[in-house]
């Protein structure tokens, strides 16, 4: 780690020594030699102090975005000019680190002049100049990475230089992209997700609405809902009023055979001037009354109830049957 930190400082020192003859004439801003000396000292101190946390935490900067950036709603809304300026920030920083300025400002490549030139330049300055200074500076990877880290770190220099969090915030604010977005965006996305979940009402799962507890054997006897007596609403089938002659003929047929065949039901319907459904229902009700009065249950039902597999007892009151 110490060898990696010492190499960028040596390259920066060599880069600052090269433009010393042209430092007096290239300071178009009227800066004195003392200002250039202080700028040179600051440039020499920057790689050791500010570059280390940036390089250790972001060794790979091949892509400009991560998956978290793609999932953000504002992804793809940046203008071409903004991305151009953000992408060319490293190359312009390398230009300042090498000591050559495009407009002739700050021959020593001071950090203050670099920031001033970056803020004062309009958007067309993002394009490389005709002399090829940007391409030449970008060709040297060491100088490019060093200068880029200097400008990015100084741009977000509101915090202490030794604080890695401060340098990370500076990088994120200066470029809007980069490796630091992975951790920061995950925190922001989680906070946004929790906020949206808190705003939505509580949702119940589907099985709460679909489960029928009466279908389970452990639910006990099923209870019928008592019928609400509504005088306004008429019954679908009016109660059949049998005459005395009809009741005598039905009872005689029931004593002969409790179960009607289709032919017997049709003949009775014609003789008594009734519907087949009315005769069928009367026979069903009559069989149910006798079965309940005797109390004899089916042997299969008794066997299943003993095993706990059959329980059709009801708790509601039974309605009145058809008149005899």
Curated annotation (Swiss-Prot):
CDD domains: homeodomain (cd00086). InterPro entries: Engrailed_Homeobox_TFs, HD, HD_engrailed, HD_metazoa, Homeobox-engrailed_C-terminal, Homeobox-engrailed_CS, Homeobox_CS, Homeodomain-like_sf. One of its GO terms (molecular function) is sequence-specific double-stranded DNA binding. Residues 235-294 bind DNA. Belongs to the engrailed homeobox family. Residues 1-59, 89-174, 215-240 are annotated as: Disordered. Keywords: Developmental protein, DNA-binding, Homeobox, Nucleus. This is Homeobox protein engrailed-2. SMART domains: HOX. It comes from Mus musculus. GO terms for cellular component: fibrillar center; nucleoplasm. The keyword NAD does not apply. Cerebellar granule cells. It is found in: Nucleus. SUPFAM superfamilies: Homeodomain-like. GO terms for biological process: central nervous system neuron differentiation; dopaminergic neuron differentiation; embryonic brain development; hindbrain development; midbrain development; negative regulation of neuron apoptotic process; neuron development; neuron differentiation. Residues 89-110 have a biased composition (Gly residues).
